[in-house]
Amino acid sequence: MEAPAITRRRRPFLAPIWLPALLGVIAVVLAVLAYRSVTTTTVVLVRHAEKALSTIDDPPLSPEGEQRSERLAQIFGEREGAGHLDAIYVTNTRRTQQTAAPLAARLRLVPVVLSGVDVAGTAARLLSEHRGGTLLIIGHSNTLPQLVRELSGKDIKPIAENDYSDIYVLSVPRLGGASVLRMKY
C-alpha cells in the first residue's frame, strides 16, 4: 500500500480578509502623513509693551507697558481649547520678558529666550518644532518685520518707534501660501 501524498492545502478564503486589512492600514498611515504635511502653524508676533523712559540700555516696562502686558494675557490667556498657545518666545531683553510674564504665568509656560541674529534659521526652526501648533513671539520694532518676512514671505510696513499696539497673526500652512493678519490691542 502506498502512502498518501502530503499536499499543502491553500486557504484562499483568508486572502480576501488580510489583503483589505493591510491596504486599510497603509491608507491610514498615508492619511496621517498627508495630514501632518499640510497642517497649518499659527505664529502670533507682538512688539514688547511700552518701555520706561530711561538712559539704561535695557529699560523695564512703563506703567502703560505693564497694563498692555496684562491685556495680552487676557487676550491669549486661555489654556485649553482652540487657539491656545503652545509656546512663548522672547528675546534676552527685560522688556520682552516683562511683556510675556503675565501671560506665561497664566498659561504656566516658561518663555523661551531666542538667541542669535540668524532670523532665517530661527524662523525655520520654530516652524519645524511647532508644526501645527500656535506660538507667540515677543520681539522688537526692528526684528518683527524680518521675522514676518521669513515666516510668511510677506513684507509688513516698518513699525514706528512709538507703536506698541500691533498684533500680527500668521497662518503658515505646510503647503501653500501663508497669510498675515494685523490687529490692534
What does each model-found stretch correspond to?
Residues 2-34, 38-132, 143-185:
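Active-site-proximal alpha-helix that buttresses catalytic centers in soluble enzyme cores
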Residues 140:
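Conserved alpha/beta-hydrolase "nucleophile elbow" surrounding the catalytic nucleophile
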